[in-house]
């Protein structure tokens, strides 16, 4: 068998997320069906991260196995041809060793969360940002973010449906940058809990609205209570940027 590693970009707005689900198209299903149409082989696609419905990706990585040794540029062309009705595209393909695993070989994952912070929304960026009309205090958000860096128990930022065995994660990057009318949050970690990024963003926004002091974020880590934290930020603003191996 030959193992192929692909890098994928997609708009998650009308999709069920990465993982196969009944009744609505997922990225995994779209790509598995596209691969079958050109190869004649049923494959299982393993992704580096399982994004939720509405979440986008710039550099999602996945792998699959085929019995055929095919030219990688032909694989890209074939997948994109059969996936063309959907907002999913493969922009890189390479051979990978048989011990490579898109999920378990990863050492770091990187996300960006986009907030449009102005009085009026955007037609072009609808479903691609979180629009917040009231001004946010970016300096307060930046201060609050420093409490989350490093190794912590992130129970307060974990979805109730999270299946991870441990709430302990190590956040290696959390930068907040204001660019004109947009606020971007850059988050990196070896791995994340379910909804962890969106729950962190939801809490930091309450700091930005001056509902909470920056120091309250530190307390959230200590109380280990999801109900004490902020709301889950909308999926529309979240982008899976890349995975490092």
Curated annotation (Swiss-Prot):
Gene3D superfamilies reported for this sequence: Pseudouridine synthase I, catalytic domain, C-terminal subdomain (3.30.70.660), Pseudouridine synthase I, catalytic domain, N-terminal subdomain (3.30.70.580)
Keyword NAD: no
Gene Ontology molecular function, alphabetical: RNA binding; tRNA pseudouridine(38-40) synthase activity
Stated role: Formation of pseudouridine at positions 38, 39 and 40 in the anticodon stem and loop of transfer RNAs.
Active site residues of this protein: 52
Classification of source organism: Bacteria, Pseudomonadati, Pseudomonadota, Alphaproteobacteria, Rickettsiales
Assembly description: Homodimer.
Catalysed conversion reaction: uridine(38/39/40) in tRNA = pseudouridine(38/39/40) in tRNA
PANTHER family associated with the record: PSEUDOURIDYLATE SYNTHASE, TRNA PSEUDOURIDINE SYNTHASE-LIKE 1
NCBIfam families registered for this protein in UniProt: hisT_truA (TIGR00071)
BP term (GO), one: tRNA pseudouridine synthesis
Name of the protein in question: tRNA pseudouridine synthase A
InterPro entries xrefs: PsdUridine_synth_cat_dom_sf, PsdUridine_synth_TruA, PsdUridine_synth_TruA_a/b_dom, PsdUridine_synth_TruA_C, TruA/RsuA/RluB/E/F_N
Keyword Amino-acid biosynthesis: no
CDD domains: PseudoU_synth_EcTruA (cd02570)
Residues bound to substrate: 111
Family that this chain belongs to: Belongs to the tRNA pseudouridine synthase TruA family.
Keywords: Isomerase, tRNA processing
EC number: 5.4.99.12
Native organism: Rickettsia canadensis (strain McKiel)
